[in-house]
Structures are given as structure tokens and as C-alpha cells.
């Protein structure tokens, strides 16, 4: 049975943080680090652009539910970030990218290890008034966005597991 919709009532737009990452910065990991440093636990990624190398993005293949087949596109050379959006909930980064290289455009779910090539400029908006987190959905095997009353976890830190790449690894076992 598919997960139910989630609506977080009472959310308010907070302050906006504009970030420029530099050559060699890890995109996903830097976003998480900046949110921790700035104490902004819940964020909407408004926009972002720049260039990356050591790229890894994942996505779903096929129409079946729950998803069982995934692609993982990796590029060691430079690609341009055309668009970037997502939600950071309890410091857990869930970001999708539209990218291009000389062969054309493609996209997917941002995975760890993607390095900034020349720059990445990103606008983040804090979400106030609600507590957001990601919880494991047993049907999809993914961590889905939820409105929660508490941030308590077993080790006190958010679990970054739950990307499509992680789900695909789990299914291969």
C-alpha cells in the first residue's frame, strides 16, 4: 500500500541563506554542514546552479510500485547544474538536480561525493513553525518526509540512509 500524503500545517517561511561553494567542496555534505553551522534544521532549497565533477545521481527506472529498478549516473568530468531543488528535514538533505553536459540534459537524486568544479551558488530558505524529519517507509524502503513532534533518534543524529542508491543496494541483498 502506498504511503499516505503528508501535510505539515503551520509552516512559515523563515530567513534566506545564500551560499557559494568553491572548487572541491562536496555538494551534499557541504549543504548538511552549513545547515548545522547555521542551526537551520529544516530548509527548502529554493534554487541552485554551478558545476560539478565526480558526479553521482540516481533515479527510478520503470513504472512499478514500489520502485525496484534504479539508475545510477556517474560522471568523473564536469557537468553544469541547470536547476537544483529539494527539502532538508532534520539536516537530512533530499535534493534533485537537472544537469547538462555536451551530450544533453539529465538529472536525478543527489548522492554523496559530488564535488563542486568552479562554483555552486545556492539559496536556502529556513522552514519555521513545524518539525520535519524523514522516516523509513516499509513499502518503498525510502525515508519519507513527515511532520513530527520530536527529533529523538536512537543516536541523536539524523540518519542519511534512504536515498534511491541505498534502496537499490538494500534490494540487491
What are these regions (language model features)?
Residues 1-94, 98-173:
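N-terminal intrinsically disordered, cationic/polar leader segments
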